[in-house]
Structure formats: C-alpha cells, structure tokens
Amino acid sequence: MMISVKSRLKIYKSGTFLVALILLAGCSKSNSSGGSGNVVVKKPDTTVTVVDTTILAPKAVTKTNTQKVYVHYLPWFETPATSGTGKWGQHWTMANEDPDVILPNGRREIASYFYPMIGPYASSDRDVIDYHLLLMKYSGIDGVVIDWYGVQNVDDYPLNKRNTDSIFSRVPATGLQFSICYEDATLAQDKAVANIDTITAAKSDFSYLQSAYFGSSSYVKINNQPLLLCFGPQGLKTPNDWQQAFSVLTTKPRLLTLDYADADAGSSASGEFVWVDSGNLNSLQSFYTNRTPGLNTWFAGAYPGFMDFYKPGGWGNTLFLIDYNNTGTLQSTLSLAKSSNAQYLQLITWNDYGEGTMIEPTLDYNFSFLQTIQTYTGVSYTITELQLIYKWYTLRKKYVGNTAVEKQLTQAYYYLVSLNVAKATAIISALN
C-alpha cells in the first residue's frame, strides 16, 4: 500500500490483501452479488445488443449557474461477478470486511461508514453507470473526472482500465463530458511489480489516453487541449520527466496538478486543482485567495465531509475527520467555490466510500447531497427526478432477462437523456 507524500493525503491500494471474514453476532451470509441482499448484479456483457427502440439524442439541462461542474469518480468497485476471482473487490472489503455478511440492519458488511442506496456494485455494470450518469445530468453536473491507474498489467489496474472504458462508452449518450485524473503514483508499482521503467510506463499510459479518449467530442477540452488532472505529481517527479512522458503526444494536454504542486511538472503544467484536507474551509480559502491569482487554469473543490474507514478496515490509520453537518459542509464548500469566481468546480467525490466523500445517493443521506447540488447549479429538477432515476435502476435489475420490459426501460432511458421526463415517468410508473 502506497501513501501519498504530497500535501494531500490519499491512500493508494495495490496488491492482494488478506481478508479476515468477520461474522458479527446476528449476521447471516449471502451469495448474492449486489444490493443489500435482494438485488442481483448481472455480469457486464458488451456483446449483447441493445433491444430495438427509439434512440433519442441527449439534450443539455438548463442551469442558472454558468460554472462548469465536474465530479471526481472512482471506477474501482468489483463484485464476485466481475472481479475475475469470484470475490468482492478490495474497495468494498479493505483488509477485513465481508460483503457476503448481512448485518442485522439488512446492509452488507462493507469497508465504509456509509452505504450506497443501490448496495455495493460493480463499476463496469452498465445499469449502474447509466444510473450514475443520469443522476449527474439531473443534478446539473457537466461531466465526470475518472480516477485512472494506467494500462499496465499490475494489481487491479486492468480492472480499473476496463471499468473506465465501460463508463466512457456510456457518456456520449447522456450528453455529459468525460476527463481523466491520472494517478501517477502507480508508476512506482509498475516498476516494483513489472519492472517497467517509469517514463516508459507513463508514455504507454499517455499514448492510450490519446488514442482512446482525447479525440472524443465528449472529452473535456480547455482551449482545445484535452483536460488531464494528475493526483500528484508523485511518479513523474521532475519537469524533465513530464516532458519525456508527453513526447509521445501530438497535442499537449491541459495538465492540472494537485494544489501547490504545478512546479514539479514545470512548463507541462497549466494549473492546479484543490483537494480535501484537514484544514477544510481554511485550506480552501487560502488556495483561492493566495494561490489562484498566479495560475492559468484552476479548479475549485467542494465536498460533503470526510470520514475514512482505513483504521477499522485494516488499511492503516485514520487520516482526519470533517463533520458533514447534514449538508452544511457541502453547502459551505460550494459557497466558497462560488465566491472564488472559479470557472471550474470539481465535486469531491461521487463515490469514494473508503474516505466518506461520496455524494451519490446513500441510505445515510438519501438524495440530500444531490439536492444541494441541484440548488447550486440552478437546474429546475428536484428530488422527484432523482427518485425516478432510482426507480428506473431498480426496475432494470428486477426485470433482467425480460426482453419486453427491458425494451420499455431502454426507451425510458432515452426519454430521460432527452429530458422527456413525462414520457419516462409514464413507463416507469406503469412498471413500478
């Protein structure tokens, strides 16, 4: 396990961890691979064609807030159906949790203090991806920034890459945008496990990004440059490292590093993005006031709170705690982002359950974080549309294999991406 040496603390998980199967009193075991005991997550199958239906082009939501709002997304979750090992992925288990254990409250035992409304899921599951992207769209979120580990066959990086590809394949249909946050700390693991030179590995990673993503019309561009965030630098440590790694690219990305770190990338960097740390609002305000005037491009940040599971999960010590204050912390960080006059905002995060920064619907906070974001972005939608999307997802899972119903739900999906809520509601209500 690698720990960031930068000013922002984040745990990097790699390798195989011994999982202690803890059976709590009153708990039971389940072999189901999704939800809280009653939802089966189907294994993704990209060879299955979408049933015949009327495909509708996506329409953009209307927002009163002109700020571009993106959300940091973790694509690292696996179920027994998708992990390749028949086991739950380590980001649901950490070192000692077992999602096959059903707790007295009906929840699966996962490595988090919080619980997804749809239960623990697979990041490559198309239904999950569509559910997430639809929620983002109706919350006024413009796009997703995916945490990406590169292309090397090391640890769980291939699964991360597969899942990212799966998400990217679903983005255009929604009309949202897509970008990458490169975890260059993984380059050290590439070297340690596969003996791949750091620069060579980075070149392979960037070549793939250029061929697979950068050219897409759905990929985020700033001044015609593809946006690339880096959670560091940590692997590429000098300006020369970055120049060498970028030498394989025909178009230089608009590279943003972590706050106060752009000098490590030299002229290859175009700015920075702020991240959550123990200083909370003081750290954000200091970045906006003292740092951003000298930056070409920068991202503000907003988050609901911070409560990591690392110590109880057996992955080291607790980092720090930021109280959620219901939705108070999210509202405060959004308010600072607005007053900073930032052109771009990154929501931290969609689904980092290990650190408790998730804004997606949970059994703990329901839709409240997304409702707060709806108010911030100035969309006309409310919890009603968010609940409708949740119902759509549950029906997708309920009627797996029922071709006639799947066709109706596919049509409802296209009504949703084209903002025809009334027609989507009619289909979903009839089935529900």
Show which residues each predicted segment covers.
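Short, intrinsically disordered low-complexity segments
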Residues: 7, 28, 41-42
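C-terminal motif of bacterial Sec signal peptides marking the signal peptidase cleavage site
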Residues: 23-26
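Sec-dependent signal peptide recognition
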Residues: 10-18
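Glycan-processing catalytic domains of CAZymes
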Residues: 41-432
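N-terminal secretory signal peptides that target proteins for export/translocation
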Residues: 1-11
